[in-house]
Each structure stands twice: as structure tokens, then as C-alpha cells.
Amino acid sequence: MKIKALLSTLALLSMAASSTAMAVEKGDWLIRAGYTSVNPKGNNHPVVSVDSAASLGLNFSYFFTNNLTVEVLAAYPFEHDIRLAGGGEKVASTKHLPPTVSVQYHFMPNNAFKPYVGAGVNYTTFFSTKTYGALEGTDLKLGDSWGLAGEIGADIMLGEKWLLNFSARYIDIETKAKLNGDSLGDVKIDTWVYTVAAGIKF
């Protein structure tokens, strides 16, 4: 449902932007910044679950042809609460950074509405992990993660330089958890990431 709603919004905005169609071409840069929401899947682990989080997202795209770009995703750290499975007591919190490098294909570089798809590689690092409640005083560690990422999105030009951006991406994040040095197994945080941003072309 979220993807359908996003696509409907993009279609409506594309009609509104049709009078300001601006091309992008080889050698152009796009810089975007805006609201980014990270939404882990519900069944992360048999014992614990990871809540959603939001932060400032940044991304940088370079057009090495008129259609193909390399994008680097960055962000201010996301902070997640970790609860007992089923939405129970908060037992920990952690921060993470999910830098992602993707190759994107932009379908209509000469139009104001520029949809694209992309695929790439994600590296996620966890830090500032704290414990509470039933786990207070214990040492919880979450290992770093490598995984694949895929995305869909669109840029909507508002003039020669300024643009709006909407995107949804899926990131494969899986961390190994340890409590006081003992393994708790893998925590699958495979997540949807939604972004609404403003950007500039140069």
C-alpha cells in the first residue's frame, strides 16, 4: 500500500511539474537532503524487535551518462529502540549509519518528472548501544552488516536547478547480536527506507 501511495503521489506531482521540464545530462550532480524513515520488518528476531526511526537523509548522485548515475546515500545517525518481541518492554537502544552506494537508471532525463530505479551495496554500522529494563547492566553488542539494496524513486524539477525527490528503498541488514559475549544469533533488520527530500542540480 505504501508503494502504491508513493507512485500515485509521484504521478500527480509530475503533472503539476510538466511546465517546468528541465533536462539532466552527463556530468551533472544532484544533491538531495530531507526526511528519511527507516522501517525494519516486524519479525526481526524470536526474542526482540527493532522499532522504526527517522532522521535527516543525504544523497549525492553523479550522471556518468544521461541515464546512468552513481548515488551515495548518507544520513545523520538513526536511533532505534529495541523491545521484547511483540511490542513489549524496551530493553535496549542503538544508533546506526547505513551508507549505501547504488547505480541508478533514470528513464526520462529530458522531462520534469524523472523516475528511476537502482541497485547497490549497503554497509551498516551500529554504535552507542545501551541496555534498559530486563537487560540493564548487561553488555549488548551488534555487529556490522553488509547487504544488497534496491530502490525506486523520482526527481521532479521545479526549475533549472531545484527539485523534489521521493524514494523507497529496501536494504538487506542482518546483524549478529551478543549479550555479555554470548551469541544471541542473527537479528534480521531488513528494512524499507522512505525519503522525501529537496535537492539541487549543478
Language model features: what each stretch is:
Residues E25-D28, N59-G133, S145, Y194-F202:
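Gram-negative (and chloroplast) outer-membrane scaffold detector with strong preference
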